[in-house]
A protein has these predicted regions:
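Oxidoreductase cofactor-interface core, primarily capturing Rossmann-like NAD(P)-dependent enzymes
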Residues: 2-105
């Protein structure tokens, strides 16, 4: 929910963001803010697409940083299988240290 949908506008702050998700998403956003100020230990924060759902492993996902990834149909999605692959890839070969990254199609 802390990914940007426009410059300076996070998904969390849009009218479309579901009210029932705000408590959990708000806590996650606060954690990211705390981590972004942390220099004493190595951390990585992973933000999924707007929708993370069961699906096949395709291996055809994109990585991003602070912007919500949108596919050519205007959707922000990732399967749990591909999300897991991206996280494991990061664990095996870290490339996002002291930053957040996101995964989507």
């Amino acid at each position: 929910a802390s990914l940007e949908v426009a410059p300076g506008v996070q998904l969390f702050d849009t009218p479309e963001f579901p009210e029932q998700w705000k408590a959990t998403a708000g806590a996650a956003r606060e954690l990211l803010q705390i981590l972004q100020g942390e220099k004493h230990f190595n951390w990585t924060y992973v933000s999924p697409s707007a929708f993370i759902e069961p699906g096949e492993r395709t291996g055809k996902f994109r990585l991003g940083t602070d912007q919500l990834l949108i596919n050519d149909r205007g959707e922000s999605r990732i399967s749990t299988q591909d999300f897991a692959v991206a996280v494991l890839d990061e664990l095996e070969s870290p490339t996002h240290q002291h930053v957040r990254f996101t995964v989507g199609y």
